[in-house]
Amino acid sequence: MRRILLSPLLLFLPVLSLSAQGMQCEAISPLGGARQTCLAAVDLARAYFPLAGMVLSGGNPVLAEGGTSGRAGAVTLTFRVNGFHLHVPDLTAIDADGTVHERSSVLAPVPVVEAQVGIFPGLSNGFLSIDGLGSVQLVPNEDFAKGLRADSDAVKLGPVSLGFGLGARVGVMNETDVRPSLALSVMHRRVPRVGYGDVNAGDRVQADANLNAWNLRGTAGKRFGLLMIAAGAGWDHYSGRANGAYNVSALPGGQGTISLPLDQSRWMGFVDGGLAFGVFRLTGEIGYQFGVDQHLDTTFEGYDDTAGSTFYSLGLQLGF
């Protein structure tokens, strides 16, 4: 198994270079299986887009914490890596029945930096306490690898462009000796448009896509000495648009532009654990994004959109 370090969008962006809506695929020549490949790519983009949203968002917005900080000015910084097992399809060989075989399986990790800041300590028992939430997503750009490009308006830091997330966590009740802390949270995350290829420079295909995510979470957490435990559930909405162009042959339908709207929602659940050593905490998470039957016409070996997907997170926290 290989390991790769990618932006969530880059997990499936190569697919989008051949993707189009069904009617757009009809304009592509059927010779050599080009139209069948296009239709399979459409299904793959629909299937894998929520996985990109999942690995961007993770589960708990503050690993191993179920409630708010409980005091104004408290700060928690988390250096986090989300990941999942990605089944990479081989679109060069599609069976007559529409089955796409798996080319490889990779562990796809995505780095995120997150912050929690106490704003309001709340009323009695922590009710209506408020924490501000923030995140920074690291997105490779043209300085990271040849052929990549990122939104020119995106904030850049050397070889990466930055995507940002903002939100809030509201306390329901504080933790006591006999009960866990409870909280609700909402976050909005945005990954800048990222792409590769340039048909004007001689490439056969080019593609770019963006991703926006809304994350709603309900969490509970408890501490037992050094041990931190939290669990929760939530709902995500992912949206974006993929644009592309292709110049694959001189035949009619061998050149053109495409645009594919992407809009999906998913439920998920997660369990966290951690060890606290003063201001340092080692944390982890395992979660599950529930599947949705999208009635795909293509079967992808190793992937079932109705079965859901498991994701993982590891994090190092600093609390002040």
Where do the PLM segments sit?
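Transmembrane beta-barrel domains of Gram-negative outer membranes and organellar outer membranes
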Residues: Q21-F164, V172-N174
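Predominantly the C-terminal beta-signal and adjacent terminal strand-loop region
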Residues: G22-Q24, Q264-G269, G274-F320
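Residues that define the transmembrane beta-barrel architecture of outer-membrane proteins
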Residues: R71-G73, V106-V113, K156-L166, D208-W214, ...
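Outer-envelope beta-barrel architecture signal
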Residues: R71-V75, G126-I130, T176-L182, W214, ...
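Membrane-embedded beta-strand positions of outer-membrane beta-barrel proteins
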Residues: V75-V81, A115, G132-G134, A168, ...
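Transmembrane beta-strands of outer-membrane beta-barrel pores
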Residues: V81-H87, I119, V136-E142, V172, ...
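Outer-membrane beta-barrel translocator domains and adjoining extracellular loop/strand segments
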Residues: V88-I94, E142-A154, R193-D203, G240-P252, ...
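Detector for outer-membrane/organellar transmembrane beta-barrel domains
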Residues: D177-W267, D272
